[in-house]
Amino acid sequence: MEFQRLENKTAMDWLYEKTDARNLQGEIDTYWVQQGGCDPVAWCRKLNRRLPLIHLKDYTVIGGRPSFAPVGHGNLDMPAIVNAADAAGCEWFIVEQDDCYGADPFEALAHSYRYLETLARK
């Protein structure tokens, strides 16, 4: 719903345009931004200095359906997302995976962690 278009803007656009940054900060979820038809990198940039937290979730397609994946193992441009969030002043990068589809969630977390370590070294 938050990315539904109303007069060429999303509900999120309206919300952030009408509020002062001192009163409203953001926390986006990369998977759901993408699923909502928007670009997570663009949203990090829109929320410059208003994005203290970000939920990093990767997006993939399994059997023709949108699905969750460990960070770095899906279709989202995680290096660009992490860089944009960092430039926006993000302080907390939270790894989350709503569904592991029967896999061990701790193993999925380990995959995400190892991938993010490679980004931190660059």
Feature locations, PLM:
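Histidine-acidic metal/acid-base catalytic patches
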Residues: 5-28, 32-122
